[in-house]
Amino acid sequence: MTKKRLVLWDIDHTLVDFTELGAAWYGTAFTAATGATLRVHPVFGGRTERATTTDLLTANGFEAAEETIQALFKALVAESERHSPTFADTARALPGAAEALAAFAADGDVVQTLVTGNLPEISRHKLAAFGLHEHLDLEIGGYGTLSVHRPDLVPHAVALAAAKHGTEFGADAVVVIGDTPNDVRAAVDNGVVSVGVATGHYSAEELRAEGAHTVLPDLADTDAVRNAVRNTVLS
């Protein structure tokens, strides 16, 4: 019997490219949430939204109180909602992303969801612009609201997937796919498989140095992506 696998996808620079778009929302969202003007801009790089928001508030002279964090989350979702009709024109799905997702969706032994620093609503907006959401179970993802530490998102998603599908996913059956060292560490810290994709700001060598078990140049070769998910072994 074929082993059931759980594939946990990153979004930005793995499946889609929204370069600079998200950063532009923060000025409006910050003012809506705090009444102040944003002076110090956020740093992303595979971090969770909770980490980004916490540091953003502190850097701009505000206490990172939960009420303020939630207000900023709400304002960011509103900005994403407002701009979402233009996403298909201002952003892009990365080569091979749709094909890889569709290939795994056609396999009865693969469950696909997200481990992403994005907020749940923004995740859907970004993916829906290119029809990518159709192949993912977004209800069982690990999102950036949960923790400042990205590795915390992995067991959350695994637990939700196990409960929904009635399957215990062993460490070698959980595959995290992403483009940053933070994606790699999220997998390695939880003892699961890391597949790095060098489609962002980090080279294949940098991802391997962080401990990625397999590194792909991109998602363009669907067979290579499927092979990485099915045949990569933990070392």
For each feature predicted by the language model, list its residue ranges:
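Conserved H-loop
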Residues: 63, 133-137, 213
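Acidic, Mg2+-coordinating phosphoryl-transfer loop and its flanking beta/alpha structural elements
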Residues: 176-214
